[in-house]
Structure formats: structure tokens, C-alpha cells
A protein has these predicted regions:
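Basic/polar phosphate-binding segments, predominantly the helix-turn-helix DNA-binding elements
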Residues: 46-82, 102-127, 131
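Intrinsically disordered, low-complexity basic tails/linkers immediately adjacent to helix-turn-helix/homeobox/MYB/SANT
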Residues: 135-136
Length: 136
């Protein structure tokens, strides 16, 4: 009987601890998901992990760990991918210069933008624009 009581108490304690962990994860998931949506809606903004982490009262390291565990990508990768998707849209729909487009998408350096764009798409911004203009 005593052993059964210990097992029951141990089980209840484990459930309490787990539910507390789950509540904490849900709280952070909601906050980090909102940040992720903000990044995707405004990729041109000057995002930096330290400021974002401070916004949710986490250390940058803990923030990055949680972000990766929730979304299976890093915050930095999300920022870059959002900027590249934004650039792709404007390359297809405007005749904005590459220099202006890079600044518009949040890059301080046009060369850095062109390198990242090629890394993620396999082509330069100019090649991407030409390819999509010829499709129309």
C-alpha cells in the first residue's frame, strides 16, 4: 500500500511538473510566433537577436534555443528568408534597381544582398528578374 502511494504521488508530481513546463512553452511559443510573424511582415526592419530576446525577457542564447526548437530554423535564417522572399516579389513586380531593392529589403550592403540572394535562390537578382520577365 505504501509503495502504491509513493508511486501515485510520484506520478502526480511528474504530471504537475510537465504541465508547468507545457504552460511555459505555450507562453513562449505564442510570443515567439508573434515575433516570427512580425519578421515575415516587415523583413526590411533592422532585426537583431539581442533586441528581440530582450523584448521577450530571455537571454539571446535561450531565445535562439527556443526559437529553433519551436520553428526548426533559426531566427536569423527566418530574417534572411523573409528578406529574400520580399526581394523576389519586388524583382518580379517592379523595375526597382538592385541597389535600391537591397536597401528596401533591409540590407545595408548591396554586395551582401546579392551574395545572400544567390546562396538562397541559386541565381543573382538580375538573373532572377530576367527569368521571371521572360516567363510573362
Amino acid at each position: 500500500y505504501k509503495r502504491q502511494m509513493h508511486a501515485l504521488l510520484y506520478s502526480l508530481a511528474g504530471q504537475f511538473h510537465t504541465s508547468k513546463d507545457e504552460r511555459l512553452k505555450n507562453k513562449y511559443f505564442q510570443r515567439l510566433n508573434q515575433i516570427r510573424m512580425n519578421i515575415q511582415n516587415a523583413p526590411h526592419k533592422k532585426w537583431d537577436v539581442t533586441s528581440i530576446a530582450r523584448e521577450v525577457n530571455l537571454s539571446p542564447t535561450h531565445f535562439q534555443r527556443l526559437y529553433k526548437s519551436f520553428f526548426d530554423t533559426t531566427c536569423i535564417q527566418d530574417i534572411i528568408q523573409s528578406r529574400i522572399k520580399n526581394a523576389q516579389f519586388y524583382l518580379r513586380t517592379t523595375d526597382m534597381s538592385i541597389q535600391a531593392l537591397s536597401a528596401f529589403c533591409g540590407y545595408d550592403n548591396e554586395l551582401h544582398f546579392m551574395r545572400q540572394f544567390k546562396k538562397y535562390t541559386g541565381m543573382t537578382p538580375s538573373e532572377y528578374r530576367k527569368m521571371h520577365l521572360s516567363i510573362k
